């Protein structure tokens, strides 16, 4: 596929359009579904928040994938540093371990201290999810991959350059997030990952008649 960059238009609701166009781009042999903001069933085991933007199941290959879709009019997509997220996990675990050892009697005089600590942990959690790529999504999608061996992806589209990429979440973590001191990922980063065969370019085509984009995404389910 190719794209006519001069003809492509950007709308105020570009993020929603990207999600709709991406879903509609899968072939007829692929079931694609956009789950509601909070998942039920299997998804509820991992989070009360949105796990992903899109699920796709290929009836020929019998493969299911989960995708988190990120779009931007800027030049990069933000993510909180790995060290910050691990610090949250450390503080949370230390408190939970300590709290598990307490009894109703020992907790009584520590009521305010416990309340203050819970508030601190809540703020740390909010901080890890204050970027475009949220920590809880990375963590939960990694758990899905680990427990069910389901491929999970983050897809990025950059409207100004009309370039779109996809990277498996575990590759994003191991080949970028853990080893960078940056607070965002840009096209140069993604191009390098593609060059190293750690991410994918998503070919796309802009259809002027409908003002929609079509993405070549079937291969992600193969």
What label would you give each PLM region?
Residues 54-75, 96, 100-108, 112-119:
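Conserved catalytic cores of phosphodiester-cleaving nucleases, focusing on short active-site segments
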Residues 73-93, 119-134:
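Compact nucleic-acid interaction/catalytic patches
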Residues 45-53, 57, 140-142, 148:
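Basic/aromatic recognition patch in beta-strand/loop cores that engages polyanionic ligands
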Residues 164-189:
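Short, electropositive alpha-helical surface patch
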Residues 139-173:
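Nucleic-acid nuclease catalytic cores
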Residues 1-50, 58-60, 222:
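Acidic-basic catalytic patches of nuclease active cores, encompassing PD-(D/E)XK
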Residues 5, 191-222:
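Charged phosphate-binding loop/patch that engages nucleotide di/tri-phosphates or the phosphate backbone
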Residues 49-51, 62-66, 136, 147-149:
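Short connector loops at helix/strand junctions that flank enzyme active sites
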């Amino acid at each position: 596929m190719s794209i006519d960059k001069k003809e492509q238009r950007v709308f105020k609701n570009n993020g929603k359009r990207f999600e709709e166009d991406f879903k509609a781009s899968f072939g007829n042999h692929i079931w694609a579904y956009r789950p509601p903001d909070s998942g039920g069933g299997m998804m509820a085991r991992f989070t009360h928040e949105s796990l992903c933007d899109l699920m796709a199941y290929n009836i020929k290959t019998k493969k299911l994938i989960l995708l988190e879709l990120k779009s931007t009019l800027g030049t990069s997509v933000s993510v909180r540093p790995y060290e910050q997220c691990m610090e949250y996990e450390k503080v949370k675990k230390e408190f939970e371990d300590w709290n598990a050892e307490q009894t109703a009697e020992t907790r009584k005089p520590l009521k305010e201290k416990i309340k203050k600590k819970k508030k601190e942990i809540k703020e740390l959690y909010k901080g890890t999810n204050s970027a475009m790529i949220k920590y809880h999504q990375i963590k939960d999608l990694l758990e899905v991959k680990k427990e069910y061996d389901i491929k999970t992806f983050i897809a990025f589209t950059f409207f100004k350059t009309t370039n779109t990429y996809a990277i498996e979440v575990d590759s994003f973590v191991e080949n970028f997030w853990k080893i960078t001191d940056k607070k965002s990922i840009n096209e140069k980063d993604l191009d390098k990952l593609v060059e190293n065969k750690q991410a994918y370019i998503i070919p796309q085509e802009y259809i002027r008649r409908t003002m929609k984009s079509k993405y070549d995404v079937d291969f992600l389910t193969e």
